[in-house]
Amino acid sequence: MINDLWYKNAVVYCLSVETFMDANGDGVGDFQGLQRRLDYLAGLGVNAIWLMPFQASPGVDDGYDVSDYYNIDPRYGTLGDFVEFTHSAKQRGIRVLIDLVVNHTSDQHPWFKQACADKNSRYRDWYVWSEKKPENADEGMVFPGVQKTTWTRDEKSGEYYFHRFFKFQPDLNTGNPHVQAEILKIMGFWIQLGVSGFRMDAVPFVIAEKGADVKESKPQFDLLRSFREFLQWRKGDSIILAEANVVPKENLQYFGDDGDRMQMMFNFHVNQALFYALASADTRPLAKAMNETRERPQTGQWGIFLRNHDELDLGRLTEKQRQAVFSAFGPDKDMQLYDRGIRRRLAPMLGGDTRRLKLAYSLMYSLPGTPVLRYGDEIGMGDDLALEERNCARTPMQWSTEPHGGFTKAEKPVLPVIEGGPYGFEHVNVAAQRRDAESMLNWTERMIRMRKEAPEIGWGSFSVLDCGDTGVLAMRYDWRNNAVVIIHNLHDKPVDISFDPGVGESGRVLIDIADGSDSSADEKGRHNMVIEPFGYRWYRAGGLDYLLKRSDI
């Protein structure tokens, strides 16, 4: 059972094959290059790798426009290379999750081409059509300001097809049983090749009712259960990590009341509140967001993240909160995207302040759920705002001071490596940070190890402690008769705090598992301490014999 729930206390590392490591020198990352860097990832301490899209694609939307679900982009290698990679990852105790993009295909997919060429094609009903342009065609765009409509006329058939995303990404008719069966077939194919699960893209759109006549789309939650049942049958410990940016009251519908749908979901609600907390030094909305997303099945888990490959979506904050985050982290219009988010990486958003960067990641590792780290974040990589839209934060990994950061020997990489300035590969790279005991990379390795040694965070229940300052977040996790207490000061000044851990006699001594600064309670059982600007503490309640006190249930 514990093995089936491996994701509860894991650390996930997200990367793009295209920009991670180029082995054959053509300027594009590939699976052979990724395989050669597995020892690096194993040393970092991650349990799972989440791969962004790598299947065959015209590449108009960074692989999210798939043209063949059963093959990989030839630039990245062959299916044989992929199998060798998954096998090598397994040997190092690393699982592989892959993006599953089944809300839509590329308009170059053979299914869509046949659907356009012949109205009687078996693939016609695999997509969503309308004889005339629906009245609401200018509503519901995913990319406002860039996207003009969700319905586009197909010149061959004269009818309009639906696309929630760009016009070159026609939506699959996921209400069609034949499409549903094909999705299961796709999942089964990649499970057979060694993957341990999927990060399912755009889940609310996948399960939505689609069609010109649909006025109020009702989610088809039974689809999620069928996906889960299929995976349980094929490989019991495989999972789906759902991208579902929904309001908290809908979360249980995605997890399933009995935990029979999605095993994991990204916690967008907490993510947005976390950035507001970092911008304002007010932790109350963050504590509120954690409480609002507290309820989940015992087998369910949140994916906790800071930045991902998309823009930082602030759409669920209030207007005042959103403007505060924009002002702090993305004041220029060039830093913003789609009227709702920021397209920067975290390090430049925080002004390169290592104290704030470590504070932010310490928060990520300590929030309820499983941390998801993005490639390059472990060394504090920057962004290139000269690149279009989201590409500014998708630049190649910076390995060394060699040309193009050691990513490729080609004259021209697939995307330019950041060069010059404080975030250039000359200054920010893996090789240099390996030699520096106080580097971001070595700190991240220590933090991942510490997080994995605190299963209370992944498995236990949490309480927010009153420490007398709204700019300080103090939390306690309880699991199997063990407790950890974690404190973060979001102020840019030192703060005096006082708190009761709330665990009785075992809370009189707090052992610092981060730097050894233990704390003893006063005669009233309260701990009094000064937390430095942007400081944090990780404590374990009781003595270091906690493992002997841990109960079996």
Task: Enumerate the language-model features and the residues they cover.
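Active-site and adjacent substrate-binding regions of carbohydrate-active enzymes
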Residues: 1-553
